[in-house]
Amino acid sequence: MIYNESTSALETKREEACPTRSPQKSTVAPSANGSGRIRTRPFIFDKMQDFTTANQLRGLGVYPYFRVITSAQDTEVMIDGKPVLMLGSNSYLGLTNHPKIKEAAKAAVDKYGTGCAGSRFLNGTLDIHIELEQALARLVKKEAVLLYSTGFQVNLGVISALAGRGDFILGDKSNHASIVEGCQASPARFHRFSHKDMGALEDRLRQIRPDAGKLIVVDGVFSMEGDIIQLPELCAIAKKHGAAVMVDDAHSIGVLGRNGAGTASHFGLDDEVHLIMGTFSKSLASLGGFIASDAETIDYLKHHSRSLIFSASMSPSNAAAVLAAIEIMVDQPERIARLWANTERMKQGLLSLGFDLGHSETPILPLFCRDVMKAFNYCKRLQEEGVFVNPVVSPGVLPGEELIRISLMATHTDKQIDFALEKLGAVGKELGLI
């Protein structure tokens, strides 16, 4: 599942820390002389015993997390020695097993070794990092780009560095957990507005003094329900109130816009979005992330973003893989066209079966179950039928909005999609979802 908050999906809410604690669990044991009882573990580990939900799900045979795949991430994967159709991958362009990308990664290992042994700030900047930053800047039409080791670190490090004391951050309530973490790590005031509610956003902006620093942060494509932020309206509101706009394009790069350049490109608003964030673990078949902006902002982040300065730099093989993936994405626009054709085929098939897909506008298709155990059972039964999907429960979505998240790839065949529709429909009827 994907997290929207910093708490575990399977944890029940705990009370705030109490002034006293009673050491009367199995964390205590008789003393050697029998005169009393001593704890064998510190209090902080008590929560591990309180956390029982995962084992309960395992006992019911429906635990859906950490499934082990023994093959490449492709349209079909191997689990427990059996082939399973993959409908849960973020590899939108189907590039994770592309021979050209694998060769580029291997060549980078031969030239640079397996790692950089330091941060970008010190000894960890390679010429291939600079080459990739320049390629990304051209793609998203920004002056400069800065690479990070993961996408999560981008949001954590950029937001906390840019928004300081006395500033204000405004974010959509459905934003990814990494955005939330970045906002909470900043000393700025953090406000969340209801999902895609532009009226609520503007109401909040009106309450902030005009000369205060203001940053609006949103997902371009929301990762659970597949809808797109209404960027033209948001940018107009931001401009009116003197706010900067940052868009997380983790699920937009390779999906939306000119050559897969993302949400701003999709709407023709390249100059209205001040910061574009992206990841490499989805369409670009690798690992890492980036922030794109004007050169002055990027230079500031180089010297103030702690998740950049205090992390080892992106491995050379990862960087080489992204460069090769960008080249393929730009040179083969038919991949994005095929992704959208596959999305339409699956979407129309699901709608004809009677599934509720919410407001999805992208290759992310949510099948609403609106029940935790139905979502887990649906996932289990589908895998038994040879289809891999992801269940999403609270806090990934609000309670009562539980869903199965399907994501399409450009490399899915019509035959695979039709097979999936057959199984999704049959199991959906079996469980009373349609």
PLM regions: where:
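PLP-dependent enzyme catalytic core of the Aspartate aminotransferase-like
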Residues: M1-N33, P99, E103-A107, K111, ...
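N-terminal "arm"/small-domain region of PLP-dependent enzymes with the aminotransferase-like
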Residues: I2-K13, C18-P30, G34-S35, F45-T114, ...
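Conserved N-terminal alpha-helix of the aminotransferase class I/II PLP-enzyme fold
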Residues: E103, A107-G151
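Active-site C-terminal subdomain of aminotransferase-like
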Residues: H241-A244, H251, L256-E361, K374
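Conserved PLP-binding catalytic core of the aspartate aminotransferase-like
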Residues: A337-M346, L351-G386, G396, G400-E401, ...
